[in-house]
Each structure stands twice: as C-alpha cells, then as structure tokens.
Design a protein with these regions (language model features):
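Helix-loop-beta segment of a Rossmann-like dinucleotide-binding subdomain
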Residues: 72-82, 94, 101, 107, ...
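Dinucleotide-binding Rossmann-like beta1-alpha1 core, especially the glycine-rich loop
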Residues: 37-112, 116, 124-125, 243-245, ...
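Short beta-strand to alpha-helix junction loop
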Residues: 46-57, 81-91, 128-147, 305-315, ...
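Flavin-dependent oxidoreductases
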Residues: 4, 169-277
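Flavin (FAD/FMN) cofactor-binding core of flavoprotein oxidoreductases
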Residues: 111-114, 135, 208-214, 218, ...
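Glycine-rich FAD pyrophosphate-binding loop
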Residues: 10-34
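Helical element adjacent to the flavin cofactor pocket in flavoenzyme catalytic cores
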Residues: 127-185, 189-196, 377-387
Length: 388
C-alpha cells in the first residue's frame, strides 16, 4: 500500500521527494509479500463501502500494470459454489453486489461447472462465475514497484530495524542510531504494526490489531485433481473471512493452494508455531475472542465453530471436501505460504472492522485496516487515501 501511495504521489506530481521506511531489510516480508495474489473482482462488498468503491477499478489498474511489465499472471477466473443447499440464495446476493460494484458475473449450471472443474460439487446445482478474477505473484509486484520507484529518483528507502520515536508536533522521526528525519506529511501503511504507529500520533486509540493467521496446504504435483480456476465456497458474509478455497498460482505450472485458515495468531508476526509470540497481546486477544463468542455479535460464534480450528488438518480437509468431495489427505502437503490478516477490532462498537479505515492525524494519514481487497485495489485505494 505504501509503495502505491508513493507511486501516485510522484505520478500526480504532488511531491518529488519521498522516504520509505521499513523495519525489514527487504520490502514485502509481511502483509503485501504474503498476500494470496488473487486479484478480486468485487463480488463480496456492500456498494456503500470503500472496498466496493475501489475494488473493480483497482483490479483493472493493477492487472494492466502487471501485464504491461510482463510479470506472471494467471487470468483463470473464479467460480463460487454453495456447499449447502440453503446457501444458494447467497449466490443471488453476491451477483447483485458484484453487478452493483461493476463486476461481470454469470450463473452456471452443473454441466458448465464440471466442464471447468470436473471434481467440483455444488449443493444446489448452480454456481457463480467471475471471469475477471486473476492471480499474480505478490512479491514480484512489490519488488518491481520498488525498483521503478528507485529508478525515478527522489525516493530513498530506509531500514529502521532498531525502531524510532516520533515528535508529531515537530514532524520529526528520531531513529535509534541518532539520525533524524523531518517530513511534510507521513503516511502510515505499516500493516500489522499500523495501529501501534497510529497510537504514537494519538490516532485510533479505540482500535487494536486482532491478527488472524492464514495457513495453506497445496495439492501434490502428482495429484490428478488440479483445478484450473479459483474455487470458492459461498462465504458467511457476517464475518470477514471467505472460507477455505482452491487457488492456482501464477507459475508456469500452477501450484494449487488450499486455504487459508482463519485462526487467531498469538502475535503480529506469529507465522509458525511458537515463533514471535506476544504473550500480553495473546492473552488480551484471547479474552476478547471469548467475549465475542459469548456475545455472538455478527455471527461470531458461527465463525468459531466453522473456521477457528481449520489449522487442524482433518478439519481443513473436511472443509475442502465440501467443494471437491473426492479430495483425500494423501493428495495434500503443507504449503510454505502463510500470512497474517491485518484485522482491526473496534473497542467502541465491540466488532471487527469490515471496511478500509483511514484516519487523519497531525501532518499524517493512518491506513489502519488494509484488509482484502487492499492489494487488489492498491492503486485506486492510494488515490482515495491521497485525496483524503
């Protein structure tokens, strides 16, 4: 997100001097580089939401940008199926939302579905086809955008692994090595750390990160089941997760990933096992999740029952078999791909935030809930953020 804002600031000649600060020695180590790579078509979002406003236009812009540079892209589309018959009516809702947002969709029968994915199952005999969904390699997108920004001149990238302090009233950052940086305007696009950065400016104090980990499995190369398109279930639209789905990569010989899980992460960078656990945060978020379960706001209890334990292989396999019943455990292997969703919790409303959230601060703008489809819509969202 930060790179796209930098790109648009230069493209629109708003500034000629930009400093990008990252805590890692290489960009894309966290949210952006670990994105699924799916360029979403805009089917899931209410028309009045920011996500709906920018998804379709943003997807077209990013897709064109990728194609112009010859970067890998798999224009494979997406098909959505109801795993249970009573979910068929949700296909109509998704189609309505998609069309309202400018997306192209069409209903398929079982014959059309099986022509593309012979092993797929629809509980109602219908499916929803989205031809404009595509898949890219997100880290390559990040690296190419970084390269082009640096080639333009006027852009420097600073690694601040040891941390920094801010003096908002003086528009000054003080780094651990003793150096300082003054700025005219600061854009906080820190992803998993964005709430912490915002709080240093006195912004968004009623929000905190509630991270959810997305683990993936993948189909073994010798498996005869190899979907050529994205295969998604009809989601529970009351919670911000799309359910376990199949996604072919943008490689020359696509790898098909299955996931992600949507299990609580016990740290902002708790990608594997006990790695980077934050005990205080984990305890606070566990208590928060328990309260959400008891209150059952927005169907949260259903999320817990259906998705919170998908990190357990038998449960993930069961969820995947709702889409492809012939799938077996021996067809799967653990993928190296894992990400953490930068999900915000609103302590005032006691709910998960379900839309982008950009808040102003002193000489600063804070992008606090860059959830999906932020990667898809990144260029269009960058313009929206710049325009305030």
């Amino acid at each position: 997100m930060g790179l796209c804002i930098a790109h648009q600031l230069l493209e629109r000649q708003i500034t000629r001097s930009i400093t990008i600060i990252d805590k890692e020695p290489e960009l894309g180590c966290h949210s952006s580089g670990r994105n699924s790579g799916v360029l979403h078509a805009g089917l899931y979002y209410k028309s009045e939401s920011l996500r709906a406003q920018v998804c379709v236009a943003g997807a077209k812009r990013l897709r064109a940008w990728v194609e112009e540079r010859g970067l890998p892209i798999n224009p494979c589309g997406k098909v959505i199926v109801p795993p249970r018959g009573e979910l068929d009516s949700q296909l109509e809702l998704l189609a309505e939302r998609g069309r309202a947002n400018g997306a192209t969709v069409e209903f398929w029968d079982e014959q059309q579905l099986h022509a593309l994915i012979p092993e797929a199952r629809t509980a109602s005999g219908r499916a929803l086809w989205s031809p404009n969904t595509a898949v890219v390699k997100p880290l390559q997108v990040v690296q190419r955008l970084q390269q082009e920004l640096q080639q333009q001149g006027g852009v420097q990238i600073i690694t601040a692994a040891a941390g920094w302090q801010v003096q908002p009233e003086q528009c000054c950052l003080n780094f651990a090595d003793g150096s300082k940086l003054t700025y005219g305007h600061l854009y906080n696009c820190a992803g998993l750390q964005a709430d912490r950065v915002a709080h240093l400016f006195g912004v968004g104090l009623n929000y905190s990160l509630l991270p959810f980990k997305g683990l993936y499995w993948q189909l073994k190369s010798g498996c005869l089941i190899q979907p050529r398109t994205n295969l998604y279930p009809v989601p529970d639209l009351s919670v911000p997760f799309l359910g376990v789905h199949f996604t072919p990569s943008a490689d020359a010989t696509p790898l098909v990933s299955i996931g992600p899980t949507a299990t609580p992460a016990w740290g902002r960078e708790n990608y594997r096992g006990l790695e980077a656990i934050e005990p205080a945060m984990a305890a606070a978020n566990l208590a928060l999740l328990a309260r959400q379960y008891l209150a059952n706001r927005g169907g949260f209890r259903r999320y817990v029952h259906e998705q919170a334990f998908l990190a357990l292989p038998p449960l993930l396999l069961k969820a995947a078999q709702e889409l492809i019943p012939s799938l077996r455990a021996e067809h799967l292997e653990l993928s190296k791909k894992v990400g953490i969703r930068s999900q915000l919790f609103n302590h005032t409303s006691q709910r998960l935030e379900d839309d982008f959230l950009c808040l102003p601060g002193p000489a600063s703008t804070h992008v606090l809930n860059a959830i999906s489809p932020a990667f898809t819509a990144s260029f269009a969202l960058a313009d929206l953020i710049i325009d305030g």
